[in-house]
Amino acid sequence: MSKVLVFGHQNPDTDAIASSYAFAYLAKNAYKMDAEVVALGEPNEETAFALDYFGVTAPRVVESAKAEGVDTVILTDHNEFQQSLSDISDVTIFGVVDHHRVANFETANPLFMRVEPVGSASSIVYRMYKENNLEVPKEIAGLLLSGLISDTLLLKSPTTHMTDHKVAEELANLAGVNLDEYGMSLLKAGTNLASKSEAELIDIDAKTFELNGNAVRVAQVNTVDIAEVLERQDAIETAISDAIVKEGYSDFVLMITDIVNSNSEILALGSNMDKVEAAFNFKLENNHAFLPGAVSRKKQVVPQLTESFGA
């Protein structure tokens, strides 16, 4: 088989980078594939912390497989085409490892596809190492642990699967770190928003979902102080409005998540605010509302929006 590119979604978070990096190593060493990990964007500050901590070089960024002379790819941490490579419809998808809903996805040929309702794609990749009796290098264990911590907010998110606790313990042992101490350091690294412009802030961790003909952008930022983020509301709303016009989104929903108290403030703009309000049974005041206990876009925001939009 010719060269295969392995990558996570656009605007990659820690799980996207970690799972793709680890899967590329697995593909080369267990499946004997000519696999290269790449990324669909630069690592965010949280991911950069993990990469630096474990001495791993960030994957190079690509936009097109064809431009790389590659026609076969493997996706991790996503499957929806609008979240993937620009020419994803023109290449062969050899495999997918994911933990999200399956939507807006089809292939011309059969493929290897593993989708599980667990806390992270990294959790699945780690299990695949064990199934193939492949030793997990320390730095890869550290990255996989980071992906799991990031996606589950240190195992506090409702997306956390009962098996994720054991996975986290095993990976922490392999990586040589204290789970709680390293976990908090990692999460705090991702809350430094002061250096970000508003345009950067709303794009740190953002995904587009096609909901009944509407392109709904759902972004999330982590913080230890929601009020501090809302001090920038006017400028954030300007950035959101610009993105709506430029990218053609019908709606933009920003989750401002307090990682300490496990709550979120929802800031939303667009043409379907009635559906956003109905999704969460709240009333937007000055374009935002409090959503207690909400920390997961995948489980506590997207399904509710999907139902409300009738998608």
Swiss-Prot record:
GO cellular component assignments: cytoplasm
Cellular compartments annotated: Cytoplasm
- Textual note on the cofactor: Binds 2 manganese ions per subunit.
**MF terms per GO, please?**
inorganic diphosphate phosphatase activity; manganese ion binding
> What SUPFAM superfamilies is this protein classified in?
DHH phosphoesterases
Q: What is its EC number?
A: 3.6.1.1
Reaction(s) catalysed by this chain, per the record, are:
diphosphate + H2O = 2 phosphate + H(+)
InterPro entries reported for this sequence: DDH_dom, DHH_sf, DHHA2, DHHA2_dom_sf, Mn-dep_inorganic_PyrPase, Oligoribo/pAp-PDE_c-di-AMP_PDE
Question: According to its UniProt record, which cofactors does this protein need?
Answer: Mn(2+)
Group of enzyme by EC: hydrolase
UniProt KW keywords: Cytoplasm, Hydrolase, Manganese, Metal-binding
The answer to whether keyword Acetylation applies is no
Binding annotation for Mn(2+) 1: H9, D13, D77
- Residues annotated as binding Mn(2+) 2 are D15, D77, H99, D151
Matching entries from HAMAP family are given as: PPase_C
| Protein family per UniProt | Belongs to the PPase class C family.
Identify this protein by name.
Answer: Probable manganese-dependent inorganic pyrophosphatase
- Identify the species of origin: Streptococcus uberis (strain ATCC BAA-854 / 0140J)
Q: What is the lineage of its organism?
A: Bacteria, Bacillati, Bacillota, Bacilli, Lactobacillales
Name the gene that codes for it.
Answer: ppaC
